[in-house]
């Protein structure tokens, strides 16, 4: 890749250069580590002091932050890339540099096993020990890295990337431009069992999981996340969703477009999460719920009922405290039931006294 100039990056991203548009940008780096040929960004005013002292060749800023820098008398003689949203501008420029470092190999490694009826486009790369079973469909420019598995009649969309040790089970669908990180499992059986009374107690009869797991376009799934196939209908992850590491998505779940789910969250079966939601790490959802669009759920929160009003923010985690204070509060919480009974007794007694006083006045 030819080294871009600051002016070229501005043109590509709808930004404005304040300074030298011919400055060559060789890479990106944090404010406190960037050198003279590197580009950094300021998206949080808390880091304004770092921006003022940074040795970066140029810094992406908002117009408002540049005015603050000018007020400090620090803007002159430096290079700034003024963008409407510095964080998004940084992300797009980072993508530009990342493309130059991507693996450009094509072809099928001789150690891969590809079923005879599968057509792999010449633009694809299939790594060593990859297994692609009969009836699978592989799109253009797909990259499937070592030891991954694509089951019978599964579909992988154009420009998707499957890192090492990814499994996409039979009949499942991965849309275009997906990124599946190592250890992801798409389409394992959902947790479906029918309880029956056997001679020694409850026995569980397996319910075959005959639905699929279907991922839309531009979905990214983090390492060791599992998205189970549906029992009869499909489990669906809509376009643009971003799912972090070690997330469990159970059977028949639907996650709406452009929702983000942070690590270690768990969504129980048949729950539907709306569009543009933000789900914090280790949040968990009971089954068969409906979660409205644009809902935010804080990390560690347990959602046990449906949320019907869009745009809400929900938190159920008790903030951390010094250990001794937490123990004292925990003791109070343990006694809440008895305390409630005492309060109710006092209320009844007060109501009785009030009624007696009223009678005597009459």
Swiss-Prot record:
Catalyzes the N-acylation of UDP-3-O-acylglucosamine using 3-hydroxyacyl-ACP as the acyl donor. Is involved in the biosynthesis of lipid A, a phosphorylated glycolipid that anchors the lipopolysaccharide to the outer membrane of the cell. This is UDP-3-O-acylglucosamine N-acyltransferase. The active site is at 251 (proton acceptor). GO terms for cellular component: membrane. The keyword Transferase applies. Keywords: Acyltransferase, Lipid A biosynthesis, Lipid biosynthesis, Lipid metabolism, Repeat, Transferase. The keyword Lipid biosynthesis applies. InterPro entries: Hexapep, LpxD, Trimer_LpxA-like_sf, UDP_GlcNAc_AcTrfase_non-rep. The gene is lpxD. It catalyses: a UDP-3-O-[(3R)-3-hydroxyacyl]-alpha-D-glucosamine + a (3R)-hydroxyacyl-[ACP] = a UDP-2-N,3-O-bis[(3R)-3-hydroxyacyl]-alpha-D-glucosamine + holo-[ACP] + H(+). It comes from Cupriavidus pinatubonensis (strain JMP 134 / LMG 1197). It comes from the Bacteria. Belongs to the transferase hexapeptide repeat family. LpxD subfamily. Its EC number is 2.3.1.191. One of its GO terms (biological process) is lipid A biosynthetic process. It holds the Pfam family Hexapep.
